[in-house]
Every structure is written in C-alpha cells, then in structure tokens.
Amino acid sequence: MSIQAIESVLQLMQAQALQAASIAKPLPLQSGFASQLMAAVGKINQTRLNATKRAQDFTLGVPGVELNDVMVEMQKSSIALQIGVQAKNKLTASYQEIMNMQV
C-alpha cells in the first residue's frame, strides 16, 4: 500500500471519528421538571438493562453470576418500573384535577 493510500484512509477515519463524536454528544443538562423526568426514566431503563445483562450473563455461564443475583436484579427492575408507572398515574390524575379547576 502506498503512503498516499494510507494517508487517504487515515483522513477518512479521522473524518468519521469527528462525525461520530458530534453525533454522540449528549444534550446539555437542563434544570426543571422535564430534565428530572428524563433522568428518572433513564434510571428505570438502566435498571432494566442491568437486569437483562445479568440474566444473559447467567444464561451464558459467566463465572461469578449466580441465580440469586439475577433474581434480585429482576426484582429491582420490576419495582422500579412499578414505581414509575404509579408516579405517571399520580401525575396524570393531578393534571386532570388541575385542568378541571375553574378559574
């Protein structure tokens, strides 16, 4: 391979890396209800992902992953989801109550 070909491949890789870095940038942190809600949903999703990963590790026979660890992670995920659903229900009921108030 010639030096020019290597340099062109290197430039292409650098351009792709810059493009990938610009796509992967997280949104700036915002304060307020919406950002708190997004953070809470993100935490619920993370517990689900952790439980799924632990179950896959157990299924594949990864050393150090026991059945009780999998069950605990699955219960944590289930409880987090139930809490999220209940919070959503309370927020929806509160919103409906506020919308029904007379001014």
UniProtKB/Swiss-Prot annotation:
Pfam families listed in its UniProt record: FliE
An example molecular function term from Gene Ontology annotations: structural molecule activity
Presence of keyword Transcription regulation: no
Superkingdom as given in the UniProt entry: Bacteria
GO cellular component, one term: bacterial-type flagellum basal body
Keywords attached to this entry: Bacterial flagellum
Localization in the cell: Bacterial flagellum basal body
InterPro entries named among the record's database cross-references: FliE (IPR001624)
GO biological process: bacterial-type flagellum-dependent cell motility
Location (main, coarse): other
Coiled coil: none
Family: Belongs to the FliE family.
Protein name stated in the entry: Flagellar hook-basal body complex protein FliE
Biological source species: Photorhabdus laumondii subsp. laumondii (strain DSM 15139 / CIP 105565 / TT01) (Photorhabdus luminescens subsp. laumondii)
Taxonomic placement: Bacteria, Pseudomonadati, Pseudomonadota, Gammaproteobacteria, Enterobacterales
